[in-house]
Amino acid sequence: MVHKDDPSPDIAARTLAALLRDIVASGRKPIEPPDISDAAAVHDLRKALKRWRAILRLIAPLVGDEAELMRVEARNLAREMAAARDGQAALEAIADLSDAGDSLPKLSARSRAVIAERLAEMGAGAQAIGLSPARRTRLGDMWSRAAAAVERWPLERFDRSQAAEQLTVFYRRVCAAVPDDWSHASPEALHRFRQRVVEHRYQMELADPLWPKLMHVWVSEAQRLRDRLGAHHDLVILQRLTEPHQPLARWRSQLELLIAERQTAHVAAAKRLTGRLFAEKSKAFRQRLASLWEHRAQRRD
């Protein structure tokens, strides 16, 4: 904790503390009001958990083992709720196919309605399980401990030099995950890259005060890339549901080609976005961030 006689924390420390408090508040909100739908609660919780995990990775050198333990706990809770997302992901994949031009020409209106109904039933059941009373209690306990930890951690020691260094570490990490050959990238490789993009997108919120307009564009482009890769992954989930003995097996022949064509379009768009976002070498990225942090600190001082 910083006392009144202590010097004001670095701009990076103040930004980090505010960001962590915002994440904790956003994670508590979906499990408190009784009138929020399970689908909306799962969506908001998954987002908060992703933000929390991304920043915990960033500050692990400062906080130590506790950050890693809390990150693993959040990851495990997110995985437990993953099944609650599959039905919704497949529904979004069907909508994506419908938005891609000539909708689903090989499927009758009746077939589309049955598919949507089955997926909705899957999603509703999984969401109810995903947010059981016991899991809500565990989530509430986790966020309470997180709130206490944020006030206890020595965040005032985090300075702009560390911010630039740590953001660069994970920028390098996402660059290393870029597929070498996009045309032959496996769903697993694209999913790993998407995970790194999500991590980077949320970590870059720390840099927002440096140049808000630029960072807004950067985060927006990262979100667009994430959305493209996410849509590709939704189609992977839909494809799995058409395999033998799965809920949509009877429509496999009609959906298979449509899924493949749409995935190709998403990969092409993701490749273009990646070329813009991650063209800069990590050394240049760090130098630019360091200069922006220094300029922002001097302007305040």
Give a label for each model feature.
Residues M1-D301:
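Function-determining surface determinants
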